[in-house]
């Protein structure tokens, strides 16, 4: 696969501590497009070896607006089905730039390990020094050892190590869109984390046409209803659950994921003045809210914004799904922060918030029907578009994404191709 691709798939056998590489077949891209289409195909190819598949969308890491998506595809311990969880911020683009479009992780290691994927190389390294550490400490340790603070990391905490059904794979220090318990799968495989760093380049079939169309696309988006807005508060308002006034006193700033026009993340200060302009001297001044549902769950328990965000921080360090914690705490009648924190290590119960679909409910439905939401998510996961922003922006038409894909690859994708792939991954 020559264009919009690193042209490599890493097959990592944790049991043997070995990695092999194979080319990304252009025929597979023509048939499955990318993203969840190919991660699903790779999962099926290695199904007998209980794989976890990391992947990127066809447009991930390009000038296409909101092309920030990376994904994890595996069998969910929560639903028992093959599901897809998103990771955004700069994780998706880093995976593609480090030299691999897809990574298949199969088998289990007899001892703790982590993966170091960089510059077209995938190493299986001893993880005994970071096993037992929380997500934040693990992330810091790897970045310090490698001497690079820009390394992107998918990590589990103690919830994953203890194989909790609600263990989450986190992105750097923060919650991801993993609502499927994929952190438990990492723990079962003795895989502590995946560290990614690279500076590859992507070739484009029609560079001038692709860049021109991306600029036109972005210009259209800038005149949309969310232009000039941003943050978790705006997301909640669009969902019909406005928390802006409740959250405002602790907001420090809003942050966008790679090349995403709308900042879907909000950083709050918990141990520092939120209006501080100079660099804080505190080591852990606050928390980046990346999941609106977790925040809303704690608000429904009657907590203050500061209490809710402090709990989100504890959940991220422990590597557990905050939405599950909030829902099960409500069922158990636990509404005090201290008693909720104490329950993290023994959390059990069934969830109603997960749903039965293939794509993470991390992305709000807004005003879409379930069928509309599912199709929009499928399109986002194929092309590598931020799943939340894809729902917020009607400008992301399937026709425009197909046009960008064809300018980028020259492969001649059609709406019929897209329909077929969507049907396949929704089976």
Label every PLM stretch briefly.
Residues 1-179, 183, 188, 192-201, ...:
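Protein-protein interaction/assembly regions in multi-subunit complexes
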Residues 13, 19, 28-31, 68, ...:
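Extended C-terminal regions of large enzymes
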